[in-house]
Amino acid sequence: MKSKNKYLLSYKRKKVLVTGTTGFKGAWLSFWLDMLGAKVVGIALKPEKSSILFNTLELGKKIKQYYLNINEYKKLNLIIKKEKPDIIFHLAAQSIVSESFYDPLTTMKTNIIGSVNILESFRINNIANLVYITSDKCYLNLDKSQSYKETDRLGGVDNYSSSKASAELVFSSYFHSYFKKDKYLRLASTRAGNVIGGGDMKINRIIPDIIKSFRKKKNLTLRNPNATRPWQHVLEPLSGYLLLGHNLMNKKLKTNLLPSWNFGPNIVNCKNVKHITKLVLDRLKSDNLKINIKKGKRFHEAKLLSLNILKAKKELNWRPRLNLEQTINFTIDWYKSYFDKKDMVSFTKDQIKLFLNN
């Protein structure tokens, strides 16, 4: 194992509780942790039809899974008390921006109250460590050409962003109320950019939308073609979460540090939706897919978004590993293998190993 990857050895034989295991990022993280020899405990809703990863990667056979809504505090707390994990990775969320417009109540309950439930159970059961995942959308977006850093103002003028900003405010409240006096950090929050990668089939996400249109030979509709986002492969922020978890478990971070980290791509990966679409279609060798631009927006979305990742580079020695072309190639190669009915457990293991060799 390369020296820069040795932090991953920290997870061997550790009991790791992951929320959101049936989701896109949660499934990738659970699979990776299982590869590392961790004893993974999952809490999540049952997989939706669009959530293909959990079953494709055979996670039901690999991890101890509880099907539960994180809004059910009593049941959630009983599981965390019973399992007493070494570390919790909290990823469960309502993660679709458009869905937050149509169903704000569920979005707010899950992203705010569900997160409070995790923090409270972590506190009263004296769990050792917590990596608490929110989103880059937690920052008050001014639609300016600036990269948001961890000390920038939180906020949101739409339901999704405000739910994520609120989750961060709740985290800050718990940290300062109960954990600020500890010598070493036990919990940290993370804010990642727009993740892409194999296995995501959610609606209103650019890569799944392209894949579905390509396979069905239907026109592709772009909702916000000029919106710029910090695109990164799903393994990039997950490597940051795992590195951060390693530092927490090994008491390498003191509480005088701000307990929040951005994980995003280098600035050259921040491109607009139209640019990403062209790269994906080129990789798919598709030049006859008609693209429609959806006129008139039902809900607000920021035009510009990028993250400042200097803190993660300096304090954690974390770096993005893939450029934009590699990110697209990793993503499309996974989908091609999936639709070609290849052994996706082996393929996904190989892709993680390839990522670690970069």
Question: What is each PLM-predicted segment?
Answer:
Residues 255-262, 271-277, 282-304, 345-351:
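C-terminal "lid/loop" region of Rossmann-like NAD(P)-dependent oxidoreductases
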Residues 237, 241, 263, 276, ...:
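Non-catalytic, hydrophobic alpha-helical segments
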Residues 6, 71, 102, 110, ...:
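Residue-level signal for the nucleotide or nucleotide-sugar donor/cofactor binding architecture
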Residues 333-343:
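Short arginine-rich
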Residues 234, 259-260, 297-319, 330, ...:
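Conserved C-terminal active-site "lid" loop/helix of NAD(P)H-dependent oxidoreductases
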Residues 1-192, 196, 338, 349-357:
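N-terminal Rossmann-like NAD(P)+-binding domain of SDR-like oxidoreductases, especially those catalyzing
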